[in-house]
Amino acid sequence: MPPKPIITKQDIINAAIQLVRENGISSVNARNLAKTLNCSTKPLFRIYTNMDEIKEDIKIELDNYYNSFMESKINDENRLLSQGLAYIEFAQNEKMIFNTLFMNMTMKGSSLQDIIHAKWNRITIENAKKVTGLSIEKSEMLFINFWLYSHGVATQIISNGIDIPLDMVQQLLENAFERFSLDITKTE
């Protein structure tokens, strides 16, 4: 009798991410994972206690993937602008993963203050202060305005299937950054 193929934790996560990428997080269940891995559901539950545990690992893996993507795209010349552009590019390239990370209530319970004070965003806000010469409070306001604008563009792309070329996205974001900066400067 040939040995049974061994399914690893990473095999399960890779299969789950493939399912998310193709059909969204709602497609990740034991039956679909087993089908993708070409096995029964037993190997899944030898490694994991339940589907919630699998989904926790999926979230971690997707967060790592997103963070790596963002880090490869962001530059300190204008971190806020490059972050917004990278965010939208990620939405264009990875619609279902973006939807899973940012549209399926993963931000539920977060306040704008939580977002402003997240370590990743503090770096961007400090850079915006340096780039614009605004106070830290005004840089936080610029960050929120720009972040919400970028999120709006990204959600239009994934929700309504609007095809916006990346060069046009860049122009939209540059205009928004300039406009938001000017408006905030007027209130100082």
Where are these regions (language model features)?
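Amphipathic alpha-helical packing segments from all-alpha helical-bundle domains
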Residues: 108-133, 140-144, 171-185
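Alpha-helical DNA-contacting segments of helix-turn-helix folds
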Residues: 20, 53-62, 69, 98-101, ...
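Amphipathic C-terminal alpha-helical segment
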Residues: 100, 147-165, 179-188
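Basic, helix-initiating cap at the start of DNA-binding domains
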Residues: 1-23, 27, 32, 53-56
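Short secondary-structure transition hinges
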Residues: 89, 93-126, 159, 163-167
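Amphipathic alpha-helical linker/stalk segments
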Residues: 56-83, 120-131
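Short hydrophobic/aromatic patch on the recognition helix
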Residues: 37-48
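Amphipathic alpha-helical segments that line or abut small-molecule/effector binding pockets
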Residues: 77-96, 140, 144
